[in-house]
Amino acid sequence: MNWMHGLALLLAAALPSAAVADDAAPLAHPTLLSSPKQARIGEQRLRYRVSFDQLDLIGADGEPAASISAIGYMAERADTDTRPVLFAFNGGPGASSVLQVEGLGPLLRVRNGTRQTLVANPHSILDAADLVFLDPPGTGFSRAPADAAARARYWSDHGDAKAVAAMIRHWLKIHGRERAPLYIAGESYGGYRLALLAADIGDLRPAGVLLVSPLLDATSSDDSAGNDLRAVFDLPSLIVAAAAHGKGELAGQPVEQVYAQARAFALGDYAQALLQGSALPADARNRMAARLAALLGLPPQALLAADLRPDVETFRLGVLAADGQQIGRLDSRIVAPLPTPHADDNGRPSAANDPALGLGRSNRINSAVMADYLHGLFGAGLPQDYVSLDIDIAMAWRFAADDGAGPRPVGSAMRFNPTPNLARLAQANPRFRVLALNGYYDLAVPALGPWYALHHSGVDPARIDFRILPGGHAVFAEEALRPQLHTLLKDFLK
């Protein structure tokens, strides 16, 4: 399950940045290797093995302070120099790499009521590439940082990216894949992580990156006064959500048409109005409020009170409030009763009550089905619990900008953008490509934000394949999309 970038940014805004010291070399555990397995993908039968690798990350005292792990799926009897390797991770921060069982890997996690099982995935991309899923410190079976100093180092944007880069290098080396075509996938905050670590892996010459509902330019989610881009980027996805629930004048139209009209309005009349700020005349302000009300199904007075800049959380709690309902943030098609305030919320953000997330009152989700699966593959030497999601990690996360002089805090919020690092990878490899997959119904990372970041990154637009699909934040969780996604990825990995 994925965690949303908006919560991480919200929680981290008040936290000081911690400097990340030069890392001592991580300590590697021996590779664990499963017995041969078999998958059927389309008409192809494929034999593969599963590996588990772990690196101990070193603290300031020179002792192991945390760990990062990798679960690999490797086809047997393949040419290891020509067969691609795709590394993948989810986001959070605090999410394990559930892309492993949510569309990419040879097994799928399915739910039958409250019970979860793993079944064969006929649309796995294992037929085109070996797959390696990374679990950062505190997720999956990876050990959480042992003390405050280690948390400051490894639960930070730069420390986390360096740990992931170290694991990628380690895995390629010990598995003899340093000459293989390299691809990297990041979902949600994983997109931000990927753009950060791109600065450190140019020598590996990646052939491409897969970005799934990616946070990239933090401006797209920053609510700081004067940042109108956030409101412009959010609006098309808000209008799509309204239409999906029969609200607004675009209700009933195909989602592609709704989004196209909403995007044109957001980048046109709406952006022009917001850019005028307080100089926008009162009559023009009232007309814009009325136009927004017609598109969103909200009262004009509410939009005037929001200074014409509705935010995702207020919208998703308000658009169906008359019916006592909220809509999802990770998937705006989902509807649930409005949350009941609890005395023990302790500042817990409203986004943690997203019905599409499924946290309930807990901050942590352990995956019994993943723990049982991996224990069955590798024996009892692994930890008991597999941590699927821990939002306490997001609450402890530290963000910084790196201007070459080392990490430092950025004003009162996070308005920084590592996406231009991808242009460096493109310059190093003329075959480098970007595939970006986004969901129409994603309110955690509205699709216009990643589009803007990528088309201001310096990457040649001819190398960018940007798709918006009829899904939510977890694009690969959409069963109906998996055949199309498999075809897209096979072409991307050629």
Predicted feature residues:
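C-terminal subdomain of alpha/beta-hydrolase-fold enzymes, centered on the catalytic histidine
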Residues: D217-R230, L298-K494
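Alpha/beta-hydrolase fold nucleophile elbow
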Residues: R177-S188
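N-terminal cap/lid segment of alpha/beta-hydrolase-fold proteins
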Residues: H29-R77
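N-terminal cap/lid subdomain of alpha/beta-hydrolase-fold enzymes
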Residues: D22-D23, G62-W155
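Bacterial N-terminal signal peptides
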Residues: G6-P16
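Glycine-rich nucleophile elbow surrounding the catalytic serine of serine-hydrolase chemistry
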Residues: G186-A198
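A catalytic-pocket lid/entrance helix-loop region that shapes and gates access to the active site
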Residues: R109, A198, G202-G297
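Alpha/beta-hydrolase active-site loop
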Residues: P136, Y154-L172
